[in-house]
Amino acid sequence: MASSSKVFKKTSSNGKLSIYLGKRDFMDHVDTVEPIDGVVLVDPEYLKGRKMFVILTCAFRYGRDDLDVIGLTFRKDLYVLTQQVVPAESNSPQGPLTVLQERLLHKLGENAYPFTLQMVANLPCSVTLQPGPEDSGKACGVDFEVKSFCAENLEEKVSKRDSVRLVVRKVQFAPMEPGPGPWAQTIRRFLLSVQPLQLQAWMDKEVHYHGEPISVNVSINNSTSKVIKKIKISVDQITDVVLYSLDKYTKTVFIQEFTETIAANSSFTQSFSVTPLLSANCRRQGLALDGKLKHEDTNLASSTIVRPGMNKELLGILVSYKVRVNLMVSCGGILGDLTASDVGVELPLTLIHPKPSQETTSSEDIVIEEFARQEDGGEEKQKALAEEGDEGS
């Protein structure tokens, strides 16, 4: 049985325009970004000699939509790329068609038109700040949207009903040649102890994938007269909002205490496994997530990989992680643990998706996943329509 290729379809409210995309996640290779290849199907009676455009917009949203009615704008367009699809402009010729575009054009007929949008490399990736329970409307963050409409020119005002919009994501994946794992050390001296306490921590590799257990190796050389009662390991997410302010948010996405007693004048080495997950932080307001598509699960935001020389302000939101290893050192005496000292180190953590395997487009079947608007709330709902071969074209 031949495998089938999934295609995402979105139709305008007036039913006259449809966008077809082979995927909604587009890979950022740091130096280049995958092009957005698709097809637009238009009713010829609706087109009526007008022009048809496809526009890609990257926007940074940092406020609620309902505040726009009082004259406050909380959305900034970071990048807009426009392509005139009908009639095609001679100064922007269409490159070679992809296999999927050829299949769609054959299936949809003469009223279907291909388009290719090649965004620049210095744009942010899709990031969403997790809203609180009382928040409504679109979440704050960076999003990408593909929009198509028919008009006499770009200045003509087009209603939402007469246009079709589909949200896509720009995502980064793990580098092909990651560097060595991070390592950190601290030495602490205590009063009345001749020798110091030495703490070392390291990870076996630089890059870790979402949902993958992270091995944190801890080595302690306790040459003091103190007793170590606990080892605490935590993972912090640091979010820098650099576009309109210098806000920085640090949220602990994993924390666990390990009861390990390390006596005076002794050594200790052990590997601990930690796994930061969104499922354990699903109600944390302001947590950075990978850009969310409706009806699909997401995860903690991936670490931002910055190309050398890139203007960080253009990235809107920068996300990084660190692993903290802390020792609770008992000072003894009458107060015991109440006067315990905290000795710790920090390790940088790169949390990201593995690079997906190359997908090949089937020459046989196309499965179309259509997004239709609900009558009451205008939200998208999703239904899968299997259209095999050329049936129904």
Swiss-Prot record:
The keyword Repeat is assigned to this record: no
Protein name: Arrestin-C
Signal peptide span: none
Molecular-function annotations in GO: G protein-coupled receptor binding
Chain spans, region Disordered: 371-393
Function: May play a role in an as yet undefined retina-specific signal transduction. Could bind to photoactivated-phosphorylated red/green opsins.
Chief site of localization: other
Subunit structure: Homodimer; disulfide-linked in response to retinal illumination. Interacts with CXCR4; the interaction is dependent on the C-terminal phosphorylation of CXCR4 and modulates the calcium ion mobilization activity of CXCR4.
Subcellular location: Photoreceptor inner segment; Cell projection, Cilium, Photoreceptor outer segment
Domain of life from the UniProt record: Eukaryota
Cross-referenced PANTHER family: ARRESTIN (PTHR11792), ARRESTIN-C (PTHR11792:SF19)
Family in the record: Belongs to the arrestin family.
UniProt source species: Ictidomys tridecemlineatus (Thirteen-lined ground squirrel)
This protein's UniProt keywords: Cell projection, Disulfide bond, Sensory transduction, Vision
UniProt feature, compositional bias: Basic and acidic residues: 371-386
GO biological process: G protein-coupled receptor internalization; signal transduction; visual perception
SUPFAM superfamilies per the UniProt record, alphabetical: E set domains (SSF81296)
Pfam families: Arrestin_C (PF02752), Arrestin_N (PF00339)
Cellular component terms per the entry's GO annotation: photoreceptor inner segment; photoreceptor outer segment
